[in-house]
C-alpha cells in the first residue's frame, strides 16, 4: 500500500485515520473498529464491505 495514499484516505464512517494491516491486506479504523478490504491494490472503502474487528484485533 502506497504510504501517500494512506495520508489522504479516511474512514467513510467517521472520517478518521486508517492504518494498513499488511497481514490481512486491510485498512483498519481503530475508532469504529472496522477493517476495509484492499483488493488488487485498491481500497474498498464501503461500509457494507467492512468487517468488524475481533476483540483480539481491537487490543493489538
Curated annotation (Swiss-Prot):
Domain of life: Bacteria
SUPFAM superfamilies given in the database record: Trm112p-like
UniProt GO cellular component terms: cytosol
Protein family per UniProt: Belongs to the UPF0434 family.
Entry protein name: UPF0434 protein YPO1399/y2773.1/YP_1194
Source species of the chain: Yersinia pestis
Lineage: Bacteria, Pseudomonadati, Pseudomonadota, Gammaproteobacteria, Enterobacterales
